C-alpha cells in the first residue's frame, strides 16, 4: 500500500487483524529498523536508499512489512521505484512469480529484501564510479570544478549510509 491515510490503515487492520501497536507504528515514521513479533504476524521496518530520478540525490525510504504466514503487506509513504519494478517483474514472469511466492510469505519477503539490496548495491557501485571520476579530475588539475561534485557525492554517501545503518 502506498501512501495510505488513517482510514486505509484502520481498514487494513480490521481486515487482517493487525496488532494495534503495529497499526500505530504504520502511521508514524520510524527512524531505525524494527522487528516486532506478535501472536500471528511480524511487524518489520526497514530503510533503503532511493535515488531521485530528477536530481540524482539519494534519500532514505521506509518500508513497513506486516508478515503473516501466508500473507505479506508492505506499506510506504514515498515512492520506492525498486519495489514497483519488482512487482512489475513478478507480473510479467509467471515462473519467477511462482518461485518467489513459494510456500510462505517469508519466501516472498526474502526475495523483496534481496531485490531492494541488489538495487542498492548497483547504486553504490554508481557512486563509487563517480568518486573515481572525481579523483581522476582532481589529479588532472580540475580541482575547482570538482569541488561541487565531491560535495554532492559526500551527501549521497552519507544518505546511503544513513538508510542502511541502524541509528542509535
Outline where the language-model segments fall.
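Peripheral, non-transmembrane regulatory/ligand-interaction domains of membrane transport proteins
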Residues: 1-168
Amino acid at each position: 500500500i502506498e501512501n495510505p491515510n488513517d482510514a486505509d490503515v484502520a481498514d487494513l487492520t480490521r481486515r487482517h487483524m493487525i496488532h494495534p501497536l503495529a497499526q500505530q507504528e504504520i502511521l508514524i515514521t520510524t527512524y531505525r529498523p524494527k522487528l516486532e513479533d506478535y501472536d500471528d504476524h511480524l511487524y518489520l521496518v526497514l530503510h533503503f536508499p532511493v535515488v531521485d530520478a530528477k536530481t540524482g540525490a539519494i534519500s532514505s525510504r521506509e518500508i513497513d512489512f506486516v508478515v503473516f504466514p501466508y500473507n505479506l503487506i508492505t506499506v510506504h509513504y514515498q515512492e520506492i521505484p525498486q519495489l514497483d519494478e519488482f512487482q512489475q517483474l513478478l507480473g510479467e514472469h509467471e515462473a519467477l512469480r511462482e518461485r518467489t511466492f513459494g510456500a510462505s510469505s517469508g519466501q516472498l519477503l526474502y526475495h523483496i529484501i534481496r531485490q531492494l539490496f541488489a538495487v542498492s548495491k548497483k547504486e553504490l557501485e554508481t557512486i563509487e564510479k563517480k568518486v573515481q571520476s572525481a579523483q581522476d579530475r582532481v589529479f588532472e588539475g580540475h580541482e575547482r570544478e570538482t569541488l561541487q561534485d565531491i560535495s554532492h557525492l559526500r551527501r549521497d554517501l552519507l544518505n546511503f549510509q544513513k538508510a542502511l545503518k541502524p541509528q542509535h
